[in-house]
Amino acid sequence: MLPHFKNSRFWLSGQTNFVFQTHPDFPALYSGPHSLSPDYEKATSRVMTFYTGVRLNNSTELLVDLEEAGGAALSTGLGLAGNTDLDIVRNPLLSKNVYLGRAMIHKVFALSKDKIENQRSFLSLFDELPRRRLELRFGKFSLPDFFDVNSVGSDTHFQFLNWTTDNNGAWDYAADTRGYTVGLTADFEDRNWGFRFAEALMPEVANGINLVYRPWQVHAENYEYELRRGILPKKAGVVRLLAYTNSANMGIYRDQIIEAEDAGTTPDITNHPWHITRKYGFGVNFEQNLTHNLTAFARFGWDNGKTESFAYTEVDQTFAEGVGANGAWWHRKQDRAGIVFISNAIKKDHQNYLADGGIGFLLGDGGLNYGCENIFETYYTVHTWRGIYLAPGVQHINNPGYNRDRGPVVVPTFRAHIEF
């Protein structure tokens, strides 16, 4: 809505994102405590963010964001591994007050004299950066700000909305229920490749708002290698390889199944003494320009599947493929459109846990006739005036919550985004 200053020490901007979603009645043989409701629903979520930043010197900046999130989610965000709205508050009991989203120091160490142009944003105020450099960040941030980024499949403001489109569903990245953590990132960048590492805090409980400030016990490590090279002649492309390990007070599905069978009860993944277990996984993130205005992308993710889904969503394996288009193709240069197919899966121990009536922090139908959760999503974002964008879309989900006895469900979507 308002112009941003170029070559300025300061940054001041904001955004508001409203997402309206609904679904009609859909078939379901049964429902449980953490099911997507089979009855007609509608819900509207909102996220409002105020971005600030100041460049302290030629290599250091301070970035602070305030945020407010509210509204509602379909079935309070339960019943889907690939939830239809990444903006929802996953704990409806959280305060609706303004909270601190990001607060970090960003330091750049030049390792070469030549410079490259940098597109200023709320994550970096520099208008140019050394071509070869080391970037350090310390403070509060969201790991997807810097890892698993994709130019056509990462932004709920302008692109897709599904959790497992915008992020790798099998990446159980360290975060509180609002998506933020506290930690340190180190990012080495060279001409056509980069490598980054993050050490971050984990929550006390699955989907919890409180982080554990004992990094010698409870912690997460994230690694990503990025190669900026296309597979098509004279067409840009990027491949990113991700790996992570989490150490936290997480339950083990098989242990809880055995314990429940011995006791003649329903398994409960939270019913265990405090202990540290480890979860690990990896991902591949690929994008390739097909033309100047059309980009194909894909993600694959995998985790060990034996340890409790804890911080992001209940996915042990995922595959997504789609395309994103820039409106310059049809002479609407600020419009965007996209289409994607996602298939999410869970491992056998996780399947058995849900089939025996167990519930996770998102899923729990009281039983399970297992099938992959398959999702189709498409959208069209229209630039209407200045910083105002409107976007109709739709998602179709087969086997919601991995259950063949429920669904399919169709979720029409309408998004209104304002930047100022």
Task: Give the residues covered by each predicted segment.
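Outer membrane beta-barrel transmembrane domains
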Residues: 226, 242-276, 297, 308-387, ...
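Transmembrane beta-barrel strands of outer-membrane/channel proteins
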Residues: 16-20, 64-68, 136-140, 197-201, ...
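Signature for the C-terminal beta-barrel architecture of outer-membrane proteins
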Residues: 163-286, 291-296, 300-307, 314, ...
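Surface-exposed coil loops of outer-membrane beta-barrel proteins
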Residues: 78-95, 99-102, 112-220, 224, ...
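Outer-membrane beta-barrel "beta-signal"
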Residues: 101-114, 339, 408-420
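Short loop/turn motifs that connect adjacent beta-strands in outer-membrane beta-barrel proteins
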Residues: 1-12, 24-25, 54, 58-62, ...
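Residues that define the transmembrane beta-barrel architecture of outer-membrane proteins
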Residues: 8, 42-48, 96-101, 178-182, ...
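Residue-level signature of outer-membrane beta-barrel architecture
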Residues: 18, 54-56, 66, 107-109, ...
